[in-house]
Amino acid sequence: AFRVWLKKRYGTIENLNRLWNTRFWGHTFYDWDEIVAPSMVSEHFEEARSMYQAITLDYKRFNSDSMLANYQAEAEAIRAQIPDALITTNFMGAYKPLDYKKWAASLDVISWDNYPAEGADSAAAAMNHDLMRGLKNGQPFLLMEQTPSTCNWLNDNRLKRPGVMRLLSYQAVAHGADTVMFFQMRRSRAGCEKFHGAVIDHAGHGNTRVFRECQALGMELKALGKAVVGARVPAKAALIFDWDTWWALECS
């Protein structure tokens, strides 16, 4: 599949050699079949560093494009049955493997999962919120996931202190979130995320501090009505966040 992607991008093996400058260190390719995915047994000399940055950079592009093609195929299948469906998928902030800016055009609305660690710098979440909002030129986004209590993959699976979930939720709204949603509604009895937080814990009822906090937040957001939904704020400053540059810099 990588070779097919390269043929579409470069047309001929001669053009690929020219643009990759494969003459350096005698790395010229004479047939498409000679090209393999970069790894420690081919181009890499460290996990993320490459002898031939162009190959590694193109492989990262190919990986992102392949995942995007899979998403687009699934979106087409949904639209064939539900033409007016609003289609999105969970982004994960500044997630390195996928070029979210390229993906954005294929999503009806941007949505992402926010899971800051206990005591994490609030600026990191703020940057990720702004990154998500910028993907569709300022269009408000959806906070698709956050935990109301614990986060199962952290070293310390701590319960959020009183008020922290509310604080993080309003931070998202202030940065342009039109929804505040949770994963998960009811905690799983087994499986990978059985220790991940939920609105309804293993206790199985709503008489818990976490449930009451979620309930109170819902009432507060309902009281706001449409005052903030769809709101836009003219930006006075901007940051350029580019996946191609990120990839190229780190594999050099």
PLM ranges: what are they?
Residues 32-39, 72, 84, 93, ...:
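Carbohydrate-binding surfaces of carbohydrate-active enzymes
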Residues 1-109, 113-127:
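Polysaccharide-binding and catalytic clefts of secreted carbohydrate-active enzymes
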